[in-house]
A protein has these predicted regions:
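A short acidic/histidine/glycine-rich donor-binding loop in glycosyltransferase catalytic cores
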Residues: 265, 283-296, 308-309
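Short amphipathic alpha-helix
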Residues: 10-21
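Active-site-proximal region of nucleotide-activated glycan assembly enzymes
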Residues: 27, 37, 106-164
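Donor-nucleotide binding loops and adjacent catalytic segments primarily
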Residues: 36, 41-45, 161-168, 172-248, ...
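A short, well-ordered alpha-helix in the C-terminal region of glycosyltransferases
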Residues: 309, 316-330
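Glycosyltransferases and closely related glycan-assembly transferases
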Residues: 46-48, 77-90, 97-112, 125-133
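Conserved nucleotide-sugar phosphate-binding/catalytic loop shared by glycosyltransferases and other
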Residues: 2-5, 22-74, 78, 294-297
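C-terminal alpha-helical cap of glycosyltransferases
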Residues: 329-345
Length: 345
C-alpha cells in the first residue's frame, strides 16, 4: 500500500516506487484524494486509487482543533481492513498520508516513510515518530537514510535519448539551444508572464523556449518559430533531455529530475509556505551548479542581464551541467523498494 498525494513532489516518487514494485510482481493499492494530482495520474498509470478525505492539520486554535483528533482517528479506523491486508505501507507525505500512518501503527502493518523535501512536512514528521524506516532526499532535520527522490524509469533512462531527436519531437530546431520553462505541476502565473514578455529577447539571443505553462493558465497553447507553449507535458523526460537550461520552481521532484540529467537551472522558490523549496536547492546554489532568484525579483530585466549571458556561454553551461550531475541520484527507487521489502521481514 502506497499513500500520498497533492503535488508532483508526493505523486511522482510514489508512482516510481509503484512501478518498480509492480515489476517485481507485487500488487499495488494507492491511498490518495480526489483533489490532488494522484486522482488522475494513479489511474492513468493502471493502479487502484482509494480516495479518502483530506484532513489538514489545524494551524491555530479553534473548533477545528477540538474536532480534529476524532475525525483523524475515524479516518484511520475506516482504513482497518485495507491496512491489515497490506504487507507494508509506504508513505510519501501530504495530509492524506497521516491517517494511513496511524492506521499502520494501530494494526501492526510495517510502515516506511519517504520525505522528498529538505524541510519535512507535518504528515511525515508525525509518521517518522511511528517507524524506524525513514528515507530522506536531502540533508534534513528528519533522521533517516539519505537516498534521494525515486525517479520514474522514463527519467532515469532518458540519457539514452538523442538530444536532437528529442527537440524535433517537441517541435523545436535540433541545432539550437533550448530553455525549458516550467512552474511545476500547478504552473506559476508570475513565471509564465515574465517568460512570455521576455520571449523576443530570448529568441534574439538565439535561444529556443519550451514553455510548460500549467493547467488553468491564461495563455493558450502556441507553436511559433523557436517558441513552444503547452499546458501540460506528458513526456517530461523528453523536455528535460532536449534542454540546455531550465527555469523552474524548486520542488523536490523537479530538482531531482534536473540533477539526475545534469541540467542546470534558474530556480525561483515558491514564495508561499515554509520555505522548503529554497532548502531543496541550497547545495546546488552553493556549488554554483544553478542560479536562484526570489519570485519578487524575477522580471524581464533579470532574464536580459543575468540569464541570457549564462545561456550564451557554452562553457558555463557545460560546467554547471557537470556540477548538477554530481548531485543526481539514479538509484533512489531501488533503495526505497529495498527498504520497503526489508521492513516486511
Amino acid at each position: 500500500m502506497l499513500a500520498g498525494g497533492g503535488t508532483a513532489g508526493h505523486v511522482n516518487p510514489l508512482l516510481a516506487t509503484a512501478d518498480r514494485l509492480a515489476d517485481l510482481g507485487h500488487s499495488i493499492e494507492v491511498i490518495g484524494t480526489q483533489e490532488g494530482l494522484e486522482s488522475r495520474l494513479v489511474p492513468d498509470r493502471g493502479y487502484k486509487l482509494t480516495a479518502i478525505s483530506k484532513l489538514p492539520f489545524p494551524r491555530k486554535l479553534g473548533l477545528s482543533t477540538i474536532s480534529f483528533p476524532f475525525k483523524f482517528l475515524a479516518i484511520s479506523l475506516r482504513l482497518r481492513k485495507r491496512v491489515r491486508e497490506a504487507d507494508v505501507v509506504v508513505g510519501f507525505g501530504g495530509y492524506v498520508s497521516a491517517p494511513v500512518y496511524l492506521a499502520a501503527k494501530i494494526f501492526g502493518t510495517p510502515l516506511v516513510i519517504h520525505e522528498a523535501n529538505a524541510l519535512p512536512g507535518i504528515a511525515n514528521r508525525f509518521g517518522s515518530k511511528l517507524t524506524k524506516h525513514v528515507a530522506i532526499s536531502f540533508p534534513s532535520k528528519l533522521a533517516g537514510e539519505l537516498i534521494g527522490v525515486p525517479l520514474r524509469e522514463e527519467i532515469a533512462s532518458a540519457e539514452g535519448y538523442d538530444i536532437g531527436q528529442a527537440r524535433v519531437e517537441l517541435g523545436l530546431d535540433p541545432s539550437k539551444p533550448v530553455l525549458l520553462v516550467t512552474g511545476g505541476s500547478q504552473g506559476a502565473q508570475k513565471i509564465n508572464r515574465v517568460v512570455v514578455e521576455a520571449t523576443d529577447k530570448l529568441r534574439a539571443a538565439g535561444v529556443q523556449v519550451y514553455h510548460i505553462a500549467g493547467s488553468g493558465n491564461e495563455y493558450p497553447e502556441k507553436i511559433s518559430d523557436g517558441y513552444v507553449r503547452v499546458s501540460y507535458c506528458n513526456s517530461m523526460e523528453l523536455a528535460i533531455r532536449a534542454c540546455d537550461f531550465a527555469i523552474s520552481r524548486a520542488g523536490a521532484a523537479t530538482v531531482s529530475e534536473l540533477t539526475a540529467m545534469g541540467v542546470p537551472a534558474l530556480f525561483i522558490p515558491y514564495p508561499v509556505g515554509n520555505g522548503e523549496q529554497r532548502h531543496n536547492v541550497a547545495q546546488l546554489i552553493e556549488a554554483d551548479a544553478s542560479l536562484i532568484v526570489e519570485d519578487k525579483d524575477f522580471d524581464v530585466e533579470f532574464i536580459n542581464s543575468e540569464l541570457i549571458p549564462v545561456l550564451s556561454s557554452k562553457k558555463r553551461l557545460k560546467e554547471m551541467g557537470q556540477k548538477m550531475k554530481q548531485f543526481g541520484k539514479l538509484d533512489a527507487t531501488e533503495k526505497l523498494v529495498t527498504m520497503a521489502l526489508g521492513a516486511i521481514k
